[in-house]
């Protein structure tokens, strides 16, 4: 999931990590 998010938006990674 992280890879997919990273591909879509660099900020997504940070948000995903915070969410997790």
Curated annotation (Swiss-Prot):
Keywords: Chloroplast, Membrane, Photosynthesis, Photosystem II, Plastid, Thylakoid
Coiled-coil ranges per UniProt: none
Membrane disposition: Single-pass membrane protein
Pfam family of the protein (one): PsbW
Protein location: Plastid, Chloroplast thylakoid membrane
InterPro entries linked to this entry: PSII_PsbW_class2 (IPR009806)
GO BP annotations, alphabetical order: photosynthesis
Region (Disordered): 1-20
Extent of Polar residues compositional bias: 8-20
Cellular-component GO terms for this entry: chloroplast thylakoid membrane; photosystem II
Role description: Stabilizes dimeric photosystem II (PSII). In its absence no dimeric PSII accumulates and there is a reduction of monomeric PSII.
Similarity remark: Belongs to the psbW family.
Subunit structure: Part of the photosystem II complex. PSII is composed of 1 copy each of membrane proteins PsbA, PsbB, PsbC, PsbD, numerous small proteins, at least 3 peripheral proteins of the oxygen-evolving complex and a large number of cofactors. It forms dimeric complexes.
Name of protein: Photosystem II reaction center W protein
């Amino acid at each position: 999931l992280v890879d997919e998010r990273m591909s879509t938006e660099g900020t997504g990674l940070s948000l995903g990590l915070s969410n997790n």
